[in-house]
């Protein structure tokens, strides 16, 4: 589908990458884990971690009765859990989503500096102006957005239900604005045939996967199935044996007959994917060709900020201003409307909504 003449221009944004956390010794890790486990009990808190956080963080969430999942399921788990405090190991929009669903709870994050290129690349002032310029369009936004952008939308979607919702809207003759991920939007447009005005954002991790390098790797492992998240470029998606959300890719590794998988998404997913498919070999998809350099190198730099030291600090610091998530109540109520619309639609399909990045 050719780009709409009304679509915003693709801008090259030099995202300010955070410094990598200082590695901890085994003794330090053990001390922090013990402290976190005790503090979770004392503070009546539960830890939820995203699939893209480091394996030791995902393991800690599981060990302490929390969960490892995508951002919406993390928020729903926290809403339904009896704990009064929710520690969200992920990026900022995930903490906001948790607060939208659980306004009465204290939502803490290891650091509020952990953000997302999709969020940064879709500032509310510019996105709202784009929507205002097309008042006859239904606004559909990916869950990987700020609370303010969600509040401006008619629908919020995850990658596991985006196709069904866009098909539904298209069947009703609705004109659609899609934001912010252009690759996911293009994939959905191709699958559904829907005409959509695209916001031109992207995920820095998935945008770096390269089709030529993937083709070279496939020659090395001809028996491997290629699993691709639809936030990847179209040339990479075209090579996939399975395309899907985080949870859908994990399911594919578990159920497909192949013994090897080349995985084009954040390598943090390998922890749960290997749990689901313990006898299978997982291979990182390449983020560049021969001699090429990568910036994210298949791991989100902001997800990497969710270390043990930062998690312990979120629970022990007396000053919560660098950890607690607040969402203005009017904004929260507005953002809840398109989220609820998606969940209600999912009920009509009798499907569980999971799977955003």
UniProtKB/Swiss-Prot annotation:
Which BP terms does GO give this entry?
'de novo' NAD biosynthetic process from L-aspartate
The record, for InterPro entries, names:
NadA, NadA_sf, Quinolinate_synth_A_type1
Q: Which cofactor does it need?
A: [4Fe-4S] cluster
Q: In which pathway does it act?
A: Cofactor biosynthesis; NAD(+) biosynthesis; quinolinate from iminoaspartate: step 1/1
- Alphabetized Pfam families for the sequence: NadA
* Cofactor descriptive note: Binds 1 [4Fe-4S] cluster per subunit.
Would the keyword Protease be found if you checked this record's keyword annotation? no
Q: Which Gene3D superfamilies match?
A: NadA-like
GO CC annotation terms, alphabetical: cytosol
What's the superkingdom here? Bacteria
Coiled-coil regions, chain positions: none
Q: Where does the record place it?
A: Cytoplasm
Catalytic activity entry: iminosuccinate + dihydroxyacetone phosphate = quinolinate + phosphate + 2 H2O + H(+)
Decide whether keyword Thylakoid is in the record.
no
Record EC number: 2.5.1.72
What family is this protein classified in?
Belongs to the quinolinate synthase family. Type 1 subfamily.
Function, please? Catalyzes the condensation of iminoaspartate with dihydroxyacetone phosphate to form quinolinate.
The name this protein goes by in its record:
Quinolinate synthase
Organism equals: Shewanella sp. (strain MR-7)
Taxon lineage: Bacteria, Pseudomonadati, Pseudomonadota, Gammaproteobacteria, Alteromonadales
Task: Name the gene for this chain.
Answer: nadA
């Amino acid at each position: 589908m050719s780009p709409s003449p009304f679509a915003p221009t693709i801008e090259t944004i030099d995202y300010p990458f955070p410094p990598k956390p200082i590695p901890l010794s085994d003794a330090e890790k053990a001390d922090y884990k013990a402290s976190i486990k005790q503090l979770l009990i004392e503070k009546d808190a539960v830890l939820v971690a995203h699939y893209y956080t480091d394996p030791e963080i995902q393991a800690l969430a599981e060990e302490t009765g929390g969960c490892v999942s995508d951002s919406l399921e993390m928020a729903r788990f926290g809403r339904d859990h009896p704990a009064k405090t929710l520690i969200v190991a992920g990026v900022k929009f995930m903490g906001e989503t948790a607060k939208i669903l659980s306004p009465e709870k204290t939502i803490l994050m290891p650091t509020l500096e952990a953000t997302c290129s999709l969020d940064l690349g879709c500032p509310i002032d510019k996105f709202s102006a784009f929507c205002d310029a097309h008042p006859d369009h239904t606004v559909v936004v990916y869950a990987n957005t700020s609370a303010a952008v969600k509040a401006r939308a008619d629908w919020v979607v995850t990658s596991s239900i985006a196709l069904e919702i866009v098909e539904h809207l298209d069947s009703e003759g609705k004109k659609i604005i899609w934001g912010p991920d252009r690759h996911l939007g293009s994939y959905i447009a191709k699958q559904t045939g829907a005409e959509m005005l695209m916001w031109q954002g992207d995920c820095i991790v998935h945008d770096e996967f390269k089709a030529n390098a993937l083709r070279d790797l496939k020659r090395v492992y001809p028996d491997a199935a290629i699993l691709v998240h639809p936030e990847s470029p179209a040339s990479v998606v075209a090579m996939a044996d399975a395309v899907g959300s985080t949870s859908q890719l994990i399911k594919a590794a578990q159920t497909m007959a192949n013994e090897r998988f080349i995985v084009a998404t954040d390598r943090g997913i390998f922890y749960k994917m290997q749990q689901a498919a313990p006898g299978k070999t997982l291979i990182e998809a390449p983020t560049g060709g021969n001699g090429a350099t990568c910036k994210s190198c298949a791991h989100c730099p902001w997800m990497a900020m969710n270390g043990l030291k930062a998690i312990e600090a979120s629970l022990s610091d007396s000053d919560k201003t660098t950890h607690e998530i607040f969402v203005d109540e009017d904004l929260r109520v507005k953002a809840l409307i398109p989220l609820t619309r998606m969940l209600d639609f999912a009920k009509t399909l009798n499907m569980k909504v999971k799977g955003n990045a």
